[in-house]
């Protein structure tokens, strides 16, 4: 049987980090087994579902490289199908109409709570065989078995068993003809021929109810795998403040999609002590039943380390487009400065994110705005003008503006003046960048460009003379 998995987000919000991990695990399991990965948009919550959220989910999936093998399925386009299946269950005596008012249902709930029982529907309409009538309280309920147990072997959690007496007759169709979650997902997974249902363990209590629906429909039962939660760094439930943000905010913060993928896969799965995987290695090695049953903790320092690894090792040509995007987000005209690939080579060892790289790269695309006064006091003081004047003369006279020629010129100054290279580099570094920290000084000057470098040296000389 061909493996078919699905990711089924609800577009009531954006794709968060937990959902992205679920999508990744579904995608990897399908790819490893040469199966199909499908996407379903569970958009039946008409009050909260938005097109903006749908678009954001699709965009995030594309950014992460989690391609799906068939067009997305939208639940709102399948309302007629849910009604057909509900009608079949009614005809077979496996479901029934109920017309209980909200007050009646609330009274049932309160009575159960007073006696210490779990709130549940008491089955008042189960045997009444009530006919259809136009009523705002009309629902269709599934006749859950009263006896026996529901048992299944979860690929992550192991054997799970619950008595049917613990389950009530759940609503499957609302008064407006829209399905409930538990009903829709069973019909969808059946129609989509899903063989492995991989989802968060917040759905595990729904599974016995869904299994009974599968049996009632005579539908083949998929295998279930319920993923543990992702907690924040303090071990608490994720919030937007502690990491449960829109996946695209990770892009906006400067993380690479393959770095995020590499990090996410390790939140619950491992292959020995190996930390870094390319995508093909993940496809070859990942197995859903190897996922840990315990909750994983977010570790932003580890994500930063993984991201920096790829910044250091990826081809600069592949890093250039996302760097350009980050530069443009800062309002920078990339054509006004050095080639992005050169910037990457200059900064890749010094930053963890592309956002940080873009911030540091501003010195090569924008006029120098200010000086670090501590750096000025230390390096732009009387006496420093000698090295700067020599630098200006030699840099202006270079036959070609190359990093090697710049480096040779600066070393010539140190030799001529019989001073250490630091006495040349540090005043020049402050003149060019406004700070006393930068990449290699020759490379820093080269990326600034001849005309801009000379202009900044002139400004530094004026600053020294007026100090």
UniProtKB/Swiss-Prot annotation:
Compartment(s) of residence: Cytoplasm
UniProt motif ('HIGH' region) ranges: 9-19
First-listed, main subcellular location of the protein, grouped into a coarse class: cytoplasm
InterPro entries given in the database record: aa-tRNA-synth_I_cd-bd, aa-tRNA-synth_I_codon-bd_sub2, aa-tRNA-synth_I_CS, aa_tRNA-synth_I_cd-bd_sf, Glu-tRNA-ligase_bac/mito, Glu/Gln-tRNA-synth, Glu/Gln-tRNA-synth_Ib_cat-dom, GluQ/Sye
Binding site for ATP: 240
Reactions this protein catalyses: tRNA(Glu) + L-glutamate + ATP = L-glutamyl-tRNA(Glu) + AMP + diphosphate
Keywords of this entry: Aminoacyl-tRNA synthetase, ATP-binding, Cytoplasm, Ligase, Nucleotide-binding, Protein biosynthesis
Matching CDD domains: GluRS_core (cd00808)
Known role: Catalyzes the attachment of glutamate to tRNA(Glu) in a two-step reaction: glutamate is first activated by ATP to form Glu-AMP and then transferred to the acceptor end of tRNA(Glu).
Subunit structure as annotated in this protein's UniProt entry: Monomer.
Name of the protein in question: Glutamate--tRNA ligase
Source taxonomy: Bacteria, Pseudomonadati, Pseudomonadota, Gammaproteobacteria, Lysobacterales
Gene assigned in the entry: gltX
């Amino acid at each position: 049987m061909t493996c078919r998995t699905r990711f089924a987000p609800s577009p009531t919000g954006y794709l968060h980090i937990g959902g992205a991990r679920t999508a990744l695990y579904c995608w990897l399991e399908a790819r490893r087994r040469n199966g199909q990965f499908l996407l379903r948009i569970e958009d039946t919550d008409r009050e909260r579902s938005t097109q903006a959220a749908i678009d954001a989910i699709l965009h995030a999936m594309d950014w992460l490289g989690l391609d799906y093998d068939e067009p997305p399925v939208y639940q709102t386009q399948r309302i007629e199908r849910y009604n057909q299946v509900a009608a079949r269950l009614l005809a077979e005596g496996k479901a029934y109409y109920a017309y209980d008012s909200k007050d009646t249902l609330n009274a049932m709930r309160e009575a159960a709570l007073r006696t210490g029982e779990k709130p549940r529907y008491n089955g008042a309409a189960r045997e009444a065989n009530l006919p259809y009538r136009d009523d705002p309280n009309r629902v269709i309920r599934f006749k859950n078995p009263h006896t026996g147990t529901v048992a299944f072997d979860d690929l992550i959690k192991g054997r799970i068993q619950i008595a049917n007496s613990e389950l009530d007759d759940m609503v499957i169709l609302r008064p407006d003809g829209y399905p409930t979650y538990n009903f829709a997902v069973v019909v969808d997974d059946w129609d989509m021929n899903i063989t492995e249902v991989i989802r968060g363990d917040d759905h595990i209590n729904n599974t016995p109810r869904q299994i009974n629906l599968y049996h009632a429909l005579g539908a083949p039962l998929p295998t279930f795998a319920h993923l543990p939660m992702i907690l924040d760094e303090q071990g608490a439930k994720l919030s937007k403040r502690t990491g449960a943000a829109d996946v695209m905010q990770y892009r906006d913060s400067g993380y690479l999609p393959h770095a995020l993928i590499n990090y996410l896969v390790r939140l619950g799965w491992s292959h020995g002590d190996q930390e870094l995987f390319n995508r093909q290695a993940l496809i070859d090695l990942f197995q859903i039943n190897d996922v840990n049953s315990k909750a994983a903790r977010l570790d932003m320092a580890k994500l930063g380390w993984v991201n920096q690894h790829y910044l250091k090792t990826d081809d600069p040509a592949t890093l250039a487009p996302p760097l350009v995007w980050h530069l443009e987000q800062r309002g920078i005209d990339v054509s006004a400065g050095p080639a992005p690939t050169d910037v990457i080579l200059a900064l890749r060892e010094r930053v963890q994110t592309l956002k940080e790289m873009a911030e540091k790269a501003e010195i090569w695309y924008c006029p120098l705005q200010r000086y670090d006064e501590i750096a000025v006091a230390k390096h732009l003081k009387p006496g420093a003008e000698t090295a700067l004047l020599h630098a200006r003369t030699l840099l202006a006279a270079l036959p070609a503006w190359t990093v090697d020629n710049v480096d040779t010129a600066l070393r010539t100054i140190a030799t001529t003046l019989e001073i250490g290279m630091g006495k040349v580099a540090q005043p020049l570094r402050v003149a060019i960048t406004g700070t006393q920290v930068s990449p290699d000084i020759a490379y820093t000057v080269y990326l600034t460009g001849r005309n801009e470098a000379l202009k900044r040296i002139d400004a530094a000389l004026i600053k020294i003379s007026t100090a």
